[in-house]
Amino acid sequence: MGDAIRIIGIDPGLRRTGWGIVESLGNSLRFVASGTVRSEDKAALATRLCQLHDGLAEVLHAAMPHEAAVEQTFVNKDAVATLKLGQARGIAMLVPARAGLVVAEYAPNAVKKAVIGVGHGDKKQIHMMVKVLLPKATFDTEHAADALAIAICHAHHRQSAAYRMALAG
């Protein structure tokens, strides 16, 4: 059947970036770890981005995932906040890419559909289903729970023929 694939899901945020790691073997999923990388609210933007970078790099070095998945950001009315979130997302994509991992991206509604079966649902439903799908899962913040949902989404999507074709070519 092959070896288990270790997947890190990343929920980017400037204050808190959640991460969650699962192992996928066939149709089964196993919880590995989760957590949250925090940046100092009062620090300069560049310093905060460095804190996110260093924290995620430490997680990747320790956990040795094979693939990564990052949630796409939404655009809101506050352009400055959206730009800062985009910069944090850039760090969330850069760190695994620099480690040589393929980085997949998923829209929030795709994550919800993969985890709860519909593209629109609230955080409570998502977190409940994460616990159903990964009974041993623990998470310190909602960001870590969201990151586990992103990893679950990637585990489901990587089984598709279209995903395998994209990797091959």
From Swiss-Prot:
<dbReference type="GO" id="GO:0006310">
    <property type="term" value="P:DNA recombination"/>
</dbReference>
<dbReference type="InterPro" id="IPR002176">
    <property type="entry name" value="X-over_junc_endoDNase_RuvC"/>
</dbReference>
<comment type="subunit">
    <text>Homodimer which binds Holliday junction (HJ) DNA. The HJ becomes 2-fold symmetrical on binding to RuvC with unstacked arms; it has a different conformation from HJ DNA in complex with RuvA. In the full resolvosome a probable DNA-RuvA(4)-RuvB(12)-RuvC(2) complex forms which resolves the HJ.</text>
</comment>
<keyword id="KW-0378">Hydrolase</keyword>
<dbReference type="GO" id="GO:0005737">
    <property type="term" value="C:cytoplasm"/>
</dbReference>
<dbReference type="Pfam" id="PF02075">
    <property type="entry name" value="RuvC"/>
</dbReference>
<comment type="similarity">
    <text>Belongs to the RuvC family.</text>
</comment>
<feature type="active site">
    <location>
        <position position="71"/>
    </location>
</feature>
<keyword id="KW-0234">DNA repair</keyword>
<dbReference type="GO" id="GO:0008821">
    <property type="term" value="F:crossover junction DNA endonuclease activity"/>
</dbReference>
<keyword id="KW-0227">DNA damage</keyword>
<feature type="active site">
    <location>
        <position position="143"/>
    </location>
</feature>
<keyword id="KW-0255">Endonuclease</keyword>
<feature type="binding site">
    <location>
        <position position="11"/>
    </location>
    <ligand>
        <name>Mg(2+) 1</name>
    </ligand>
</feature>
<feature type="binding site">
    <location>
        <position position="71"/>
    </location>
    <ligand>
        <name>Mg(2+) 2</name>
    </ligand>
</feature>
<keyword id="KW-0460">Magnesium</keyword>
<keyword id="KW-0233">DNA recombination</keyword>
<keyword id="KW-0963">Cytoplasm</keyword>
<comment type="function">
    <text>The RuvA-RuvB-RuvC complex processes Holliday junction (HJ) DNA during genetic recombination and DNA repair. Endonuclease that resolves HJ intermediates. Cleaves cruciform DNA by making single-stranded nicks across the HJ at symmetrical positions within the homologous arms, yielding a 5'-phosphate and a 3'-hydroxyl group; requires a central core of homology in the junction. The consensus cleavage sequence is 5'-(A/T)TT(C/G)-3'. Cleavage occurs on the 3'-side of the TT dinucleotide at the point of strand exchange.</text>
</comment>
<dbReference type="GO" id="GO:0003677">
    <property type="term" value="F:DNA binding"/>
</dbReference>
<keyword id="KW-0238">DNA-binding</keyword>
<protein>
    <recommendedName>
        <fullName>Crossover junction endodeoxyribonuclease RuvC</fullName>
        <ecNumber>3.1.21.10</ecNumber>
    </recommendedName>
</protein>
<dbReference type="InterPro" id="IPR036397">
    <property type="entry name" value="RNaseH_sf"/>
</dbReference>
<dbReference type="GO" id="GO:0006281">
    <property type="term" value="P:DNA repair"/>
</dbReference>
<dbReference type="GO" id="GO:0000287">
    <property type="term" value="F:magnesium ion binding"/>
</dbReference>
<feature type="active site">
    <location>
        <position position="11"/>
    </location>
</feature>
<keyword id="KW-0540">Nuclease</keyword>
<dbReference type="GO" id="GO:0048476">
    <property type="term" value="C:Holliday junction resolvase complex"/>
</dbReference>
<feature type="binding site">
    <location>
        <position position="143"/>
    </location>
    <ligand>
        <name>Mg(2+) 1</name>
    </ligand>
</feature>
<keyword id="KW-0479">Metal-binding</keyword>
<dbReference type="InterPro" id="IPR012337">
    <property type="entry name" value="RNaseH-like_sf"/>
</dbReference>
